[in-house]
């Protein structure tokens, strides 16, 4: 098994690590299996696909962590004996995303409803803020991250409407995101999933605007946001993808309010078991 990740690697304490934990659980139960973590250093989509192509002949199963790996569709068709687990996207073939019924036999691809956990994160933030200002910090404006952003905003709006509150979702125009279609989606985007320094700068900028609850969906960059929260007074963070309570430890206290779980490790673990028992089938699931 190979697992190819974004630049933040499989020890990012968030997205990549959750996928990796699914592999590790499978290996614990199947000690003859092995895993090789491969870190794609740039985050560029073409480079991500090339990183997979470079090792495709060496592994039975390749786990691809993130939207930037969507372009593996052609590669998968050219290598039918290799199984692919694609997280956060359906594959593209010749640059076009497949439809639900255009299954590639050796690709199990999974989308998640991030807007749902984002909604609850927004509710939690709106109900917990003392300053009346909250924000969401993302890495790159991939579809999954935009889902988190819009879900969060809707959660805050819902609380405002039902509880008679006026909580503001703060966005800094200089950190607005551009999605995969080229549209400006607003929000607060670090521009990377492995830039803790910029994450801290962005976190501090939001705190300076009065934000006291930060929903952090930025992978390794989010560690910098958490640092900014720890160094401030009365600021809380909401984790993403995994339970990030341990990341919130700050002396005798903890700055993590809650976390929005994605449970990708179960997907990876279950599909690896299907490979093992021969029941694996290509699929595009949500």
Region locations from a protein language model:
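A residue-level marker of the well-folded mature domains of exported/periplasmic proteins
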Residues: 1-286
